[in-house]
Amino acid sequence: MSFIVLVNGYRCAKNTDDTLGAVFSDTAIKRIFGNNININSPENYANQTIPAYINADNGRVIDDKKATLGRVLFYDKALSTNGNIACASCHQQEFGFSDTAVQSKGVNGLTGRHSMRLINARFAREAKFFWNERAATLEAQTTQPIQDHAEMGYSGLDGDPDINDLLAKLNALDYYQELSAWAYNQSDSKKTLSENNLQECLGAFIRSIQSFDSKYDEGRRQLANNQNNAPLPNFSSDENAGLQLFSAPPIFDNLGSRIAGGLGCGGCHRAPEFDIDPNTRNNGFVGSIDNPTVLDLGNTRSPSIRDLVNPRGHLNGPLMHTGSITSLETLIGHYNRILVRPGNNQIDPRLTPGGFPQQLNVTPTERQQFISFLETLTGKAIYTEAKWSNPFAL
């Protein structure tokens, strides 16, 4: 059972457990995870505080038990054929659940695109996942890397084992026998994990990874819920100027050159979620990661642009599906003067005003103001919070 409560401007999803009093074995859980997992007092994933001004939510109701099981799955290298790669290998907590490598290393080679950050994956208007939106939901996405030959190896093709081989391996492990019985309320310990269970639990854990304790959020909480682009009382003058540059649309001349207004970033990455507009087309980055001369036009999904940098001010890994942007200055440079490759007939029209590639004419002062604003979107807890950390680390 579940219900929603609204308290002091925040909303929380409250879950009740219909099986209170049931007793579950945790001998293997204690042996493997020590004090990192306590089934008698699981971490709070379901009832986290969500600011009342956050509206976009593509998620399902999160269950603490299933998210706990999802945390184990996320960090377990047993999900790869050689036992060396976990989901967390490419989505590292210290880097905002991103990867500092341009291409992540899998069991049989490198990934075909840069690994996306997973922060606030739930809080987006776009429900599809992957850069090219090939997964209809986050849950559908979670087992595709497992079944990729290069990434985790359970493809079932050309001699690879398949997902059923993985399930047999996991169901033979005593800690999964205990965790799955507990998560699915089957005290007889006869619960076996299915692919749907993996998707549900991994999805619950990833959906729980949220970041709403940034400087931006501290100021945003002081305004009315619909004041997404208003100056924030805790911001410096440069940060507020950067916010306005981000939010305000540019005014172009008849050749696509900006003569007034802002930079228009909020047209595709709307505050306060800073997610991607579901109707966005590509942003001009259309090269393939392995061969920049080969066009890869369909990459229209983006993670939230919250936590682009970590609390130390360092970029949380390279940006774009090619991983070719390695600084915020380079990011601004790309949008400052859009280059439309021959054959790119799917570029977002917001980047080609009047049919001309945009020229934003960003000044050095505007560049620094814009970067100052982007740095206010960095949270704190996600980088160190134990409930999102590696439970195998004793």
Question: Whereabouts are the PLM-identified features?
Answer:
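Bacterial N-terminal signal peptides
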Residues: 1-5
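N-terminal Sec signal peptide cleavage junction
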Residues: 10-12
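C-terminal capping alpha-helices of c-type cytochrome domains
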Residues: 163-182, 186-188, 192-212, 321-394
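Short glycine/threonine-rich turn/loop motifs
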Residues: 14-144, 217-336, 341-344, 386-394
